[in-house]
Amino acid sequence: MLTHKTCQARKKMQVSFVIRDAEEKQHRNGVNALQLDANNGKLYSAGRDAIIRVWNTRTDSSEKYIQSMEHHNDWVNDIVLCCNGRNLISASCDTTVKVWNAQKGFCMSTLRTHRDYVQALAYAKDREQVASAGLDKAIFLWDVNTLTALTASNNTVTTSSLTGSKDSIYSLAMNPSGTVIVSGSTENILRIWDPRTCMRSMKLRGHTENVRCLVVSPDGNQVVSGSSDGTIKVWNLGQQRCVQTIHVHKEGVWSLLMSENFQYIISGSRDRNIIVTEMRNPSNKTLVCEEQAPVLSLGYNIDKTGVWATTWNSDIRCWKLPMYDRCTMNSSGGMDAQWTQGGTEVACIKGGAAIKECAVLNDKRYIITKDSQDQVVVYDVLRVVKKEQLGAVDYEAEVKKRNKQVYIPNWFTVDLKTGMPTIVLGQEEVDCFSAWVSIEAGLPECVDPTTEIKINYGKLLLEALLEYWTPPHSIPPNEMEPDMHGNGYFQVPKHTPVIFSEVGGRTVCRLLVRDAAGDSESTLLHETAPQWVTDVVIEKNIPKFLKIPFFLQPHPQMTKPERTKKDRLVANEFIQCRKVCEHVLEKVLNAETTPSGGNANNSLQNSQSDANSEGSQLPAEERIELWCNDVVVDPNMDLRTVRHFIWKQSTDLTFQYKTKQNFNYDGSIGDSLERVTRKY
């Protein structure tokens, strides 16, 4: 028997997974950050779809994709290349900082020091030092050489922290020599530290809204900041003041890029414009381009004649930069300066569509989505696959057409934050074990439709997601016993990412379905999987049935209206109404007992006997009619569907019954509660 590690202090957990292709070569949402390895011509992009992708910028082919780097499960907000391009550091909304082998694309280690979204990174190239900051108001300093040396056995790392921030940090910058680090936050101020001593040296006021982007000059004497207030400010740290305010954008400035000589500012804004401005003469500016969406990040191309730009959309474009020509002679013989033509799109890395809308169908197995390109798709949540590509059809009409009049409790939620459907299973507001259905309704393709087996969607799905998990120290299965791995009905795609996380909090474990058999993954699952998961996956416990109380009484049109007794029963909520008809027929009306004819003659008795014999061969639903709220109930409906669509009241469900034929009846309803509960 497996002994699962438990801890009373452990936070409540949830399990989520993503329905996606085995290889997602395109970004499926906006791109938050870029890093260029100029030596190898590789462009790294950090996506809101939780994936870092690598692109070959030296090819003219439209196929620039090299590989994906996957281990985050929420937006990747920032990335930095270090160690001459050998390693990459990433920061994410999943509250982690990850260290990657940039060449091979695998995650080397995960840092879980932050307690909230990690928004920004800063890198001091000369010192191989990285700083991270986020919404938890904390700034941590990391030695890159130490991070890249971490192993499974040597996994302890120390960090220095910079304290004093009073609000969420959205931007961070450091000069190459690591003598100055600057943070920007929703305090609307800049805070400056000396990372060598971890001492705060000053704070600078001037912005009126969140400081979204920062650049520090190589010598550490100047800082350029961009803010949601729409301004760009130049700060002199020696004078501890703002020396210039630049107004070139109509909305917030979200990205900054400086020329090597620190004379020109390239800025990207929420207003979708990318503008080049001479820092000493802000009136000398020119529009590079107008993007299709707010600009999130900017980065030079290899020869710095162009700039890569990312936006809320998933495309990544490279725009030719205009050059500032000071050698143009004017009509009076003097020299004028002017910008050469720029703004031409020289390359584009196409992105994919992000899912923007989602509807869960009443059967609680399928969802219908609509993406940013108006494509409508049907997904099978239970089997974790795309079921049908409908194209650019009427989304609402498809939802209406495919919704059946059936009620099944919610057992999962859908998160579209990454642009791909993420299904969340838990035990909080939505109980993943609440959906019991008959197997002919839930898995008609798997069994004989005449069977009366009941299945639990949540249990089957968890068993499929963790099919390959063999916990350490578990007893090997007996050779004479059947293998109990999986759910016995279906498998899910092996490439499916499965994430264990705290409810409303940090990620604890992420793995692919196929990797659960690995020793390290198995041990990690054993340490992190919540008890409600191991109960069904390892212990093979059956989730409890949910029951519905209801009243049963004769219809006013019954031949014996004096029978007005109203009895309360309890049954499993997934019981079909035909079972209630059978109960009425067998236990209330005693239809199986041949009624005596009294003083009637033999011919009449024989006639009645023949009729009763013929009628007894009919199914109960053809002999008994159930009513609810003056509506005839479909015998194929289950109790919860009747309560949801017909009864529509908070009080106990009430049925009325009457016969469809003139059957004689006699009997009582006194023992119905116990018998209905046991049989159904």
From Swiss-Prot:
Xref: PROSITE patterns: WD_REPEATS_1 (PS00678), WD_REPEATS_2 (PS50082), WD_REPEATS_REGION (PS50294)
CDD domains: Ubl_WDR48, WD40
Alphabetized SMART domains for the sequence: WD40
UniProt keyword annotation of Repeat present: yes
One GO term of the biological process aspect: double-strand break repair via homologous recombination
Parts of the chain that traverse the membrane: none
GO MF annotation list: ubiquitin binding
Region (Disordered): 592-616
Top-level taxon of the source organism: Eukaryota
Keyword terms of this UniProt record: Repeat, Ubl conjugation pathway, WD repeat
Family recorded in the similarity comment: Belongs to the WD repeat WDR48 family.
Function: Regulatory component of the Usp12-46 deubiquitylase complex. activates deubiquitination by increasing the catalytic turnover without increasing the affinity of deubiquitinating enzymes for the substrate. The complex deubiquitylates the wg/wingless-signaling receptor arr/arrow, which stabilizes the receptor and increases its concentration at the cell surface; this enhances the sensitivity of cells to wg/wingless-signal stimulation.
Assembly mode: Catalytic component of the Usp12-46 deubiquitylase complex consisting of Usp12-46, Wdr20 and Uaf1; regulatory subunit that, together wtih Wdr20, stabilizes Usp12-46. The Usp12-46 deubiquitylase complex associates with arr/arrow; the interaction leads to deubiquitination and stabilization of arr/arrow.
Name of the protein in question: WD repeat-containing protein 48 homolog
Lineage: Eukaryota, Metazoa, Ecdysozoa, Arthropoda, Hexapoda
